[in-house]
């Protein structure tokens, strides 16, 4: 099967320099969602018709399985499909989709393709409570589709029809090529309508059939930021429903954003306002507090992520305790029962089991052993202004508060660093190391007195 995706429109009502089909739904361009659905149908040829912002669209979705056709002037849907004809295989039917209709399911399209077979024209239609603005499906007394009339060209009787054309069609490619060559633009819009192929099919004795989606929202197009927001909420509602049906506890299903793939084990609980980006896996018994952002990460079984944490390309081990207000940056790997507390940042560091950094610390480019206590205000000074260097902290180390470890440096097993230490060379095992200015008390000192203003 050939699949053609129309993605040439300007999107004037978006009031944006970004091509319409690149506006995101769930963090990804609308067109990317349509391409994913198209690929689920295993097409032999996949063609995207570009126009407005063509270079940006090509760059955004370029792939080995995608060919591009260009529509320099946007002269209607029929004209757009004409541009793809040289890239199509006439021995296969062609399915036409739209880059600004991101929620259509593969199951709905498969049903349409099955209904049409290889010899019939198939149209995806839907009954709308208010069909204003949409092309109407006109049927004869026997219920057969005879034509599609656009809103601006419809009579009053035709405007009363509630069954509308979604624009998605499938038909034999040879017939499509013939019918497109006969299209005229003598209509209110002055455009070449793809929908006019229905009348050509009827005239040629080609049966026209229809299929309907499981839900109206599958066919919603986006022409404004308001419609984009509506589609986003529908999509997020669908994601929330999927999670709930899989046994995840969402404290408010209306306040979660999944911008990628979120998979969960058993007895997972997610509080309000959380955002999941990329591929995220939450293992059994995980609890995510309110307003966390988690991207391309795994959270181990029984771990708790307290509110307002940011976790990016990191792995939290089983029974971990993160936050509140903690940040785990790329390359962070935490072992079992590791505690990363409030206002602690960890970057490109491996922290072994049962270690803790509970307050106000930066652990970057470091290897931390087991049962290590990192005191409040501890900083791994990993950057010399040009290069990054690593800090190694072995098992059972105790680091006092307000300590700086100037990398590259190693703290040996069982060592203790006194509060306020600036460590510039290796701290030996099982010993106390500290560097601290001598404390002085100046008996004759007096606090300055504020001078009156003149």
Curated annotation (Swiss-Prot):
Which UniProt key words apply to this protein?
Acyltransferase, Cell shape, Cell wall biogenesis/degradation, Cytoplasm, Magnesium, Metal-binding, Multifunctional enzyme, Nucleotidyltransferase, Peptidoglycan synthesis, Repeat, Transferase
Would you name any one GO CC term?
Answer: cytoplasm
Q: Where is this region: N-acetyltransferase?
A: 247-454
Q: Which reaction does it catalyse?
A: alpha-D-glucosamine 1-phosphate + acetyl-CoA = N-acetyl-alpha-D-glucosamine 1-phosphate + CoA + H(+); N-acetyl-alpha-D-glucosamine 1-phosphate + UTP + H(+) = UDP-N-acetyl-alpha-D-glucosamine + diphosphate
Q: Binding positions for acetyl-CoA?
A: 376, 382-383, 401, 419, 436
User: A single GO molecular function, which one?
Assistant: UDP-N-acetylglucosamine diphosphorylase activity
Binding positions for Mg(2+)?
100, 223
EC number assigned by the record: 2.7.7.23, 2.3.1.157
One biological process GO term for this chain? UDP-N-acetylglucosamine biosynthetic process
Quote the cofactor binding remark: Binds 1 Mg(2+) ion per subunit.
Check the record and name the InterPro entries matching this protein. Bifunctional_GlmU (IPR005882), GlmU-like (IPR050065), GlmU_C_LbH (IPR038009), Hexapep (IPR001451), MobA-like_NTP_Trfase (IPR025877), Nucleotide-diphossugar_trans (IPR029044), Trimer_LpxA-like_sf (IPR011004)
Cofactor dependency: Mg(2+)
Q: Where is the active site?
A: 359
Job of this protein: Catalyzes the last two sequential reactions in the de novo biosynthetic pathway for UDP-N-acetylglucosamine (UDP-GlcNAc). The C-terminal domain catalyzes the transfer of acetyl group from acetyl coenzyme A to glucosamine-1-phosphate (GlcN-1-P) to produce N-acetylglucosamine-1-phosphate (GlcNAc-1-P), which is converted into UDP-GlcNAc by the transfer of uridine 5-monophosphate (from uridine 5-triphosphate), a reaction catalyzed by the N-terminal domain.
- Name of protein: Bifunctional protein GlmU
- What does UniProt list as this organism's lineage? Bacteria, Pseudomonadati, Pseudomonadota, Betaproteobacteria, Burkholderiales
């Amino acid at each position: 099967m050939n699949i053609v995706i129309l993605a040439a429109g300007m999107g004037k009502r978006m009031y944006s320099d970004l091509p319409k089909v690149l506006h995101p739904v769930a963090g990804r361009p609308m067109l990317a969602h349509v391409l994913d659905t198209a690929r689920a149908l295993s097409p032999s040829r996949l063609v995207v018709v570009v126009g407005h912002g063509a270079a940006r669209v090509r760059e955004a979705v370029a792939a080995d399985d995608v060919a591009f056709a260009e529509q320099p002037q946007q002269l209607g849907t029929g004209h757009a499909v004409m541009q793809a004809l040289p890239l199509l295989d006439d021995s296969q039917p062609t399915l036409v989709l739209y880059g600004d209709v991101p929620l259509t399911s593969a199951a709905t399209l498969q049903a349409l393709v099955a209904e049409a077979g290889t010899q019939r024209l198939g149209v995806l239609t839907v009954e709308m409570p208010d069909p204003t603005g949409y092309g109407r499906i006109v049927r004869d007394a026997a219920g057969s589709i005879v034509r599609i009339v656009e809103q601006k060209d419809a009579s009053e009787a035709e405007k009363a029809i509630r069954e509308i054309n979604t624009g998605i069609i499938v038909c034999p490619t040879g017939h499509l090529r013939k019918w497109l060559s006969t299209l005229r633009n003598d209509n209110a819009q002055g455009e070449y309508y793809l929908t006019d192929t229905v009348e050509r099919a009827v005239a040629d004795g080609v049966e026209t059939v229809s299929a309907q989606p499981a839900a109206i929202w599958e066919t919603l197009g986006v022409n404004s930021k308001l419609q984009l927001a509506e589609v986003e909420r529908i999509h997020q509602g669908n994601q929330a429903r999927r999670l709930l049906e899989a046994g995840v506890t969402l404290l408010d299903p209306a306040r979660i954003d999944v911008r990628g793939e979120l998979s969960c084990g058993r007895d997972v609980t997610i509080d309000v306002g959380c955002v999941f980006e990329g591929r995220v896996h939450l293992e059994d018994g995980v609890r995510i507090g309110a307003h966390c952002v988690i991207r391309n990460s795994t959270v181990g079984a029984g771990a708790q992520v307290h509110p307002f944490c940011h976790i990016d390309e990191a792995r939290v081990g089983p029974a971990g305790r993160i936050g509140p207000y903690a940040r785990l940056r790329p390359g962070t790997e935490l072992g079992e029962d590791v505690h990363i507390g409030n206002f602690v940042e960890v970057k490109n560091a491996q922290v072994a089991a049962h270690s803790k950094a509970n307050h106000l610390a930066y652990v970057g480019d470091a290897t931390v052993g087991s049962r290590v206590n990192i005191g409040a205000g501890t900083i791994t000074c990993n950057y010399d202004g040009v290069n990054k260097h690593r800090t190694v902290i072995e098992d059972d180390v105790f680091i006092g508060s307000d300590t700086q470890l100037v990398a590259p440096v190693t703290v040996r097993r069982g060592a203790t660093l006194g509060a306020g230490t600036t460590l510039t060379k290796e701290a030996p095992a099982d010993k106390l190391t500290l560097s601290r200015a001598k404390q002085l008390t100046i008996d004759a000192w007096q606090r300055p007195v504020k001078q009156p203003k003149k």
